[in-house]
From Swiss-Prot:
This is Protoheme IX farnesyltransferase 2. GO terms for molecular function: protoheme IX farnesyltransferase activity. It comes from Pseudomonas entomophila (strain L48). The lineage of its organism: Bacteria, Pseudomonadati, Pseudomonadota, Gammaproteobacteria, Pseudomonadales. Its main location: membrane. The chain crosses the membrane at residues 9-29, 36-56, 83-103, 108-128, 135-155, 163-183, 209-229, 230-250, 264-284. The gene is cyoE2.
Amino acid sequence: MSVKHFIQITKPGIIFGNVLSVAGGFFLASKGHVDFALFLAVVIGTSLVVASGCVFNNCIDRDIDHKMERTKNRVMVQGGMSLTLALAYATLLGVAGFSLLYVQANPLAAFCALVGFVVYVGFYSLWLKRKSVHGTLVGSLSGAMPPVIGYCAVSNSFDLAAVTLLVMFSLWQMPHSFAIAIFRFKDYSAANIPVLPVARGILAAKKQIVLYVLAFVLATVMLTLGGYAGLGYLAVAAAMGLYWLYMAWGGYKAEDDSKWARKVFGFSILTVTALSVMMSVDSQTAADVLMTYAR
């Protein structure tokens, strides 16, 4: 056991991705008036909570991770850390993260983090991931919480912008996850995990990817229509979203489903990164009504 194991078991890549979305929500709510001490506390607090969830996930999935090519070398599978130590480590990370969010941000931000944590560890990892094709849908709520945490840490209110962020990032999670399930089809089949491509076929997953990307594109527009983000954000969101939709539609003609799915997955990362950046730099004063720009 080494320091490397303590880092690897937290899934640093997932933490980094969540930091980007936390920052997007935080700066969206800040509207140019940034409290950097608060920002640092929110980023660290959320990262600790996410890390805790990932460690718990590693503990829960240790019996199926050895069946999958991409997870067979994880710390718990290789015996790099005992279950007792991993559970204690996960608990410590969680307590530290929730405490930091509660004390340095506000109870609402901590509550949002708790909801995401419970959904990911309890409903998704412990239950639905192995039992239902709808596990991805439920799990998407946890993946959508980081930008909401960032936003609520500043605004201390769960308003239309927070709802929009929750919907946007939940919708984004679906095609992102389905794409992974397609190019990792053999892994999920071997572990008997009922993700959509395995349970209902790749064609069904392709249809859902197109529908969810379309819904995501429509949802991204709401930040501008609600008066929370500017036209620069709208232009980037529309361009990225429509190209992602075009790419998703191309799945119907794809000769190599795995190659196509990897492209959809890769562009999903670019899309959510671009939107997080744009909502950070092109925020507007919040509107009281939905159709600010439609008057």
